Amino acid sequence: MAKRSRSEDEDDDLQYADHDYEVPQQKGLKKLWNRVKWTRDEDDKLKKLVEQHGTDDWTLIASHLQNRSDFQCQHRWQKVLNPELIKGPWTKEEDQRVIELVQKYGPKRWSLIAKHLKGRIGKQCRERWHNHLNPEVKKSSWTEEEDRIIYEAHKRLGNRWAEIAKLLPGRTDNSIKNHWNSTMRRKVEQEGYLQDGIKSERSSSKLQHKPCATMDHLQTQNQFYIPVQIPGYQYVSPDGNCVEHVQTSAFIQQPFVDEDPDKEKKIKELELLLMSAENEVRRKRLPPQPGSFSSWSGSFLMDDSMSNTLNNLEEHTTEFYSMDENQTVSAQQNSPTKFLAVEANAVLSSLQTIPEFPRTLELIESDPVAWSDVTSFDLSDAAASPVKSTPVKLMRIQHNEGAMECQFNVSLVLEGKKNSRNGGDSEAIPLTSPNVVKFSTPPTISRKKKRIRVGQSAGSELGSASLSEVGNRRIKHTPVKTLPFSPSQFFNTCPGNEQLNIENPSFTSTPICGQKVLITTPLQKEATPKDQKENVGFRTPTIRRSILGTTPRTPTPFKNALAAQEKKYGPLKIVSQPLAFLEEDIREVLKEETGTDIFLKEEDEPAYKSCKQEHSASVKKVRKSLALESWDKEEPGTQLLTEDISDMQSENILTTSLLMIPLLEIHDNRCNLTPEKQDINSANKTYTLNKKRPNPNPCKAVKLEKSLQSNCEWETVVYGKTEDQLIMTEQARRYLSTYTATSSTSRALIL
């Protein structure tokens, strides 16, 4: 056999079927591997070579096959061509042996397990275990719920069976693939199986014609709603018949309490499946019809009037909900209602797992009779409207003077018994939607005070006064802050069998449970103008934030460019340019004009301190009035002025005087020029310009000293106010005056 040991991953990933090999390339192989599919001639040749040389030297065998490595030849023989390889069905003895070996070595060391099974390779053992022998694999018949999950997942994921298998614990990707290809595809495509959504699942309930609040409806109404994490509540129709119990749905799983890292991903995928499955019910849902419900206990009731009230309160603060109904609620009318019955034990006991919740129950537990006797409440009047359900939201406010207060926002408004015209005791538990709290900052109690003042009946005066006192005490507090936990957590915990403990209340906010408050008027839309509201100062302005800033804004491309520049080279700094750099710029310009470098650059030349504007202005003035021409080159080491003034144009004379004096100091004081030509020639002979490199012949070049020592001297030279410059300027004027007298066109010299 081969001398080189193979890793288990390589053994598992290499297939024994006749196809291209995706074997990782290894270092040290002298031949380039050919990844092309094995041909029949190569297989025949490999069989003959194995018969001749055996299976001990694969390098020798690979040398007879072009572009095939010894590793490829070995695997081709062991996985495909070996006549001892068993490709048929598994026997009971083999299955029992695999089970024993897995218990001994674990479900990952398949290469080692395959060595104990003659004729089987690691890949075969692995697939046999995961698809058939694993006790966690379900072998029962496929249920309709599993079919629906496969159908919905296949519409979105296609043939990604491994991803679909994550949605069905206990089912393998291979079994799901076989079930789809053999049974489900034909039934779905030809017989219309599962095409009508969830209708077949609910056929036994015979309530398809009844209106119901579906989970999809809750999803569209509330952004905090997570359908796959609501363990224990049910939807009921007005006549009390249960349409769907979420706790028994196959799509719902208990909240992930274990440490499975993929649990959250699975829940999101299940949520997508559930949303699509509920689409059919939402589209085929009939218009809501009035009904009646006479008796219930231990439940929270959803009232249509609450939905109407939320519409009226939230129309100025949010656009998240679509509000199609806008009605006026009468104080004397009562209408049949739709409600959401939430199992108290399932929800409230599960809330105990939230750290903030035990304190909120203290207030409820202080008056168990007032809070547990839900049957003492009647539903307020309202026309049928879509039920808007938002998650539970608890907020805590300071406790004052022993008044037990709490706010239990389940988006459910439980209104007290309506007072008759002659008056009477009643209880009110006004609850506020968290959406109102989310989009407006004033305290909840101030809103309740204004809402109750709209009432019209006589019995509302006492309730209005009581809540006004509470509002006056609460108005000085800051608006309700964001809670440190998601409101949806109250429905996201698994239900238990604990009973509601209401003996030690906690102090939260809003409804006064310890006092008897009379509310006999329904909640109506406020008629007070927006600018006259008491809490208008607390409301968040609707001004766009983009116009609040006064600083100029840099376009995004420039921001990105500056950020990249600072990231690469550090923060940008503004560095002032020294005068030495300006001198180099002037030298470069003059060098381009004259063709030669007429300045002497020394290592210790000082940095000039003249103003940048004066320097540039003087250079422009000289360049504008004079034309520069190239110097005659006599020797490579020096540049001398010509002695023959008749052959040189007047521009050369002026250029010499103006270019040499600003940067070079006069060698001696004998250079006072006279109007005669011999003085000019003597001055020209006195000066020589050294190039940047030292002149090898000191006799032919005169080394000039440093430049001016002070700013005043520098300015005098720059502006041409030295004695020599004035003399040269006067000579230039005389020369040009004679030139203009003989010429036909007049030329003016601007200095």
Curated annotation (Swiss-Prot):
Residues annotated as domain HTH myb-type: 30-81, 82-137, 138-188
Pfam families per the UniProt record, alphabetical: Cmyb_C, LMSTEN, Myb_DNA-bind_6, Myb_DNA-binding
Residues covered by region (Disordered): 1-22
Residues within the DNA-binding region(s): 58-81, 110-133, 161-184
Location in chain, cross-link Glycyl lysine isopeptide (Lys-Gly) (interchain with G-Cter in SUMO2): 199, 591, 601
PANTHER family in the cross-refs: MYB PROTEIN-RELATED, MYB-LIKE DOMAIN-CONTAINING PROTEIN-RELATED
Name by which UniProt lists this protein: Myb-related protein A
Lineage, opening ranks: Eukaryota, Metazoa, Chordata, Craniata, Vertebrata
Gene it is expressed from: Mybl1
